[in-house]
Amino acid sequence: MGCCCCLPSIPESSRTIDEHLPLSRATPSSLSNAYSSPLSPPIPLAITNINLQTSPPKLPRTQGNSSEASPGLTQVVPEKKTWHVDDLTDFELKKQYREAIDECPICLEEYEIDNPKLLTKCGHDFHLACILAWMERSEACPVCDKELVLTES
């Protein structure tokens, strides 16, 4: 057997010499008509515009239980909820957070005896070497961007 080009039913004389030329060397007239003819436009999709559909008019809303509003048009406003918050200050919360995460925010390494941590007035702690190098470039805390003041301890 063989491929479709090798079938005996197709005479070799029907093949043209253009079949063996690369497209870059072929003349434009020898290119297929599919490449030179314009493409047909795409088939349009059936689109329905949601904005064109009619909707019932919106009724005016009133708050509360006024006597002049009809019962179908009133809106009940829920009561204000209060949330219980512990009596912890921001500094105490930051202290609890620092104890939970015991690493320097600049270098992301844990604190060790060789490289101690230093606490700032804004409540953040850093390696001594890291914060001193930071203070050469900036006067703001690397975490909260407040003025960087070191504590005396």
UniProtKB/Swiss-Prot annotation:
SUPFAM superfamilies: RING/U-box (SSF57850). It catalyses: S-ubiquitinyl-[E2 ubiquitin-conjugating enzyme]-L-cysteine + [acceptor protein]-L-lysine = [E2 ubiquitin-conjugating enzyme]-L-cysteine + N(6)-ubiquitinyl-[acceptor protein]-L-lysine. It comes from the Eukaryota. Disulfide bonds: none annotated. InterPro entries: Znf_RING, Znf_RING/FYVE/PHD. Pfam families: zf-RING_2. Its EC number is 2.3.2.27. Induction: Induced by salt stress, cold stress, drought stress and abscisic acid (ABA). A zinc finger (RING-type) spans 104-145. It is an enzyme of class 2 (transferase). It is found in: Cytoplasm, Cytosol. Changing H124A: Strongly reduces E3 ubiquitin-protein ligase activity. GO terms for biological process: positive regulation of abscisic acid-activated signaling pathway; positive regulation of hydrogen peroxide biosynthetic process. Possesses E3 ubiquitin-protein ligase activity in vitro when associated with the E2 enzyme UBC8 in vitro. Plays combinatory roles with AIRP2 in the positive regulation of the abscisic acid-mediated drought stress response. Plants over-expressing AIRP1 exhibit tolerance to severe drought stress. This is E3 ubiquitin-protein ligase AIRP1.
